[in-house]
């Protein structure tokens, strides 16, 4: 499937493109503010920040930041709707085209690791979704529960289970569908060997000392509560939010709904759970990011070195 127009490939819109990734709380947004907004625009690669109404819990770039440097793929979907990796590729391709037409360079920035890999290589050759199989898998999950679904995935496709977060039921369900439909694990269907359209991005990975990252995650979660995360959740509930909404599977939201299912709403307990989940997720992110080839790992505290790396790439 092609997600990009002929004009994009012929105009060399992928001649310069930058990937900027790292775990949650590492400091990606602060770095973006040091870039020249006349030369760069940002394409968001966070699977929760694509949703409207999910601002504080997703640590979405503030309106001030978005007004400082142009951002794409923020607030493009309602939280009750699915947003697939194929959707991301389609949106990101169009954003790249627009950015290059403006004479700028796109920076794809975020923490959803598989967005980067699939944007670079495209989708795997896994069989397409089948309505009957999907209904069968959905019925089993409805009967046995989400924890059972992830245990089942761990049995039939441990490689995918290592890559997929247990609460990401869209991807868990999809992996189970592929297994039921083909008898083969999703992980056995490989990505194309070559990048799409001859893409050769500058790939910058941001990494910090683990103790410092843990501290930053803790401060970030405190800031979320101080900025009104609980009020944001109450606003979603007034909208009729349900725990099954795809946008609410993200860390910072699912913990509230899990607490309510147990008849509890303790700020301290929920905050602790969000922090634990965030730390665990950061470790999983780094594991995935380290599988990426040709990553230039850099300390976000050394902004000048990063900006120099970007400048040299843009002049190449």
Predicted regions, residues:
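Phosphate/pyrophosphate-binding catalytic cores of soluble transferases and nucleic-acid-acting enzymes
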Residues: 1-316
